[in-house]
Amino acid sequence: MSQIALSRARLPTTLEISVTDEFGEPHRQAIAAERALTLYLNRREIVTLMTLGAEPEALVVGYLRNQGLLECVEDVEAVQVDWEVEAAAVVTRHLPEDLEARLSQRTVTTGCGQGTVFGRLLDATALTPLPPTRLAQSVLYRLLDNLGAYNETYRSAGAVHGCALCQQDRVLDFVEDVGRHNAVDTLAGRQWLEATGSEGEADIFYTTGRLTSEMVLKVAQMGIGVLVSRSGVTQKGVELAERFGVLLIARAKGRHFQAIHADQRLILDAPPPKRPGDRDAARARRKTSGARG
């Protein structure tokens, strides 16, 4: 890969403010940073992202990659971030011939912190179903336990999402940002810029955010067949996951989870002990679900 002219514009992810607690006592509290960063591709304004500012170069490259506006890292000549003007300039050797057409086909999504996806990606015909990846329940539990050590910004300040590339129960790479889509884009950009190879090793993607259509699309583009979240799933996310062969694990907290499109891919080798009332609670959830349907 040719050398990229890359700025190093990392900023602190938290700052302290004065707050008053419920007893009227003043104290200092860490809060998550949130900064606007306008992305320019060969002087063409693309989007303004709200970000922590931890890895802005990786974020903008990953954004362009995941939106289908950048086909390979070898096309990138320079990535320069200037926080004084809140801008990131990406210079490439080539641009998609239909760039203007792609930019005109933006769809507002349910993603917080970003919320757009280009029409070419929603068409989804360019993506083929992924080979099935099997996941053992015991591996999922170990992974969830291991992930607890990585949410440093969330523990100190809250108000951020985290995403991770994982190989079974091993965390390969972890990123936090104010939006879950920023976090996945930063991971994608980091893998390209650092050429670490961990994306190729990853078979599980973890996010703290909802499993929406945009999240499923981005993970499918990365070739990862298992998507895990501590949050819930949307209708379009379920539909696209079925099309691409992505196993969804939603509401994964502690020893609880909800698997979608599991088929024979989820190996139930570590069922947790049932507690009094679990059966009644499950029956009530099924009854409520049936009434809503």
Roles of regions detected by a PLM:
Residues 186-238:
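Glycine/small-residue-rich hydrophobic helix-like segments
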Residues 149, 170, 211-212, 233, ...:
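Short acidic/polar capping segments at secondary-structure boundaries
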Residues 55, 136-139, 143, 159, ...:
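General structural feature for long, well-ordered alpha-helical segments within catalytic domains
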Residues 2-162, 166-168, 172-174, 293:
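Intrinsically disordered, low-complexity regions enriched in acidic/Ser/Thr/Pro/Gln residues
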